[in-house]
Regions:
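N-terminal Rossmann-like NAD(P)+-binding subdomain of aldehyde/semialdehyde dehydrogenases
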Residues: 1-114
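Conserved small-residue-rich beta-alpha loop and adjacent elements
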Residues: 106-133
Length: 133
């Protein structure tokens, strides 16, 4: 099994090591995640928003733990660790506009047929997001 190692640029020491998954285990996890995503998308929007905001609040409560860890991993001064204010602000805004933004968009009001755009979940999406600093 391979490892992923995070080396702190502050002192060149290993900050963390994590084992990678085998292809088979990763594929099994993807199948579980696809099933979970279907169950998630079946929940009412208000419930999903509530659960996401609970997660945002949980991350906010961990701010004092997370900021020093990020600083150590990235080699960035702790004083620049204010991302979580913006994270919560963006999440709050998205939750406020979600219901209206996700409604069907009527293309025409022709009585002979209905044309509209419906936003539906894409399903499972894998992202390796960079941490910009």
């Amino acid at each position: 099994m391979n490892e992923i190692t995070c080396i702190s640029p502050i002192n060149g020491e290993i900050f963390a090591k994590r084992n990678t998954l085998s292809l088979k285990v990763a594929q099994e996890k993807v199948q579980l995640l696809r099933a979970a995503q279907k169950a998630w998308s079946a929940r009412p929007l208000a419930e999903r928003i509530s659960l996401v905001m609970e997660g945002v609040d949980a991350v906010g409560k961990m701010n004092d733990q997370i900021v020093p860890e990020l600083a150590q991993m990235m080699g960035r001064p702790i004083r620049y660790g204010g991302e979580f204010g913006g994270f919560k602000e963006r999440a709050q805004y998205m939750s406020e506009i979600a219901e209206e933004a996700l409604q069907d968009i009527e293309i025409s009001n022709d009585s002979s047929f209905k044309r509209y755009i419906r936003r539906i979940p894409h399903g499972l999406v894998f992202v390796v997001a960079p941490w910009n600093y």
